[in-house]
């Protein structure tokens, strides 16, 4: 393929452990043509190290979302819980149900992993506006180019 996309909340980079993620990263590298591009939008592990645990709320168009972000430092794993309240409905005491564990990666880790697979990062961003990535931004968007074809 000329391009492989991995947008937020997708399966790539959102699995519980390194082994399963590395299988998917390898499939990405093998699927790309020489000179192909891979765009990845994932949560930033470096941000999680310094900002989690935390609780956030987001007022959307139709409702309010309460989120809890827990962090297992030794495993570099996010445990995420969420409760949604629709506007106009009765409010009840939230019971956060623990979601699936998600292994998060830093920019350095992703650069090293994909480098071993023949891809190099050419740009990294904090969001879709083109803002440069940093450890103080929750999202990490990376654009990778293939250097070699992995067989």
Predicted regions mapped to residue ranges:
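A short acidic, Gly/Pro-enriched loop at the edge of an enzyme's catalytic core
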Residues: 1-4
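Residues lining the SAM
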Residues: 6-9
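Surface-exposed cleft-lining segments at the edges of enzyme active sites
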Residues: 11-17
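Short, glycine/charged-enriched secondary-structure capping and boundary segments
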Residues: 18-21, 53-55
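A short glycine-rich, Lys/Arg-flanked "PGG" loop and its adjoining helix->strand segment in the class I
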Residues: 20-37
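SAM-dependent methyltransferase
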Residues: 39-112
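C-terminal lobe and adjacent flexible extensions of AdoMet/dcAdoMet transferase-like proteins
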Residues: 104-151
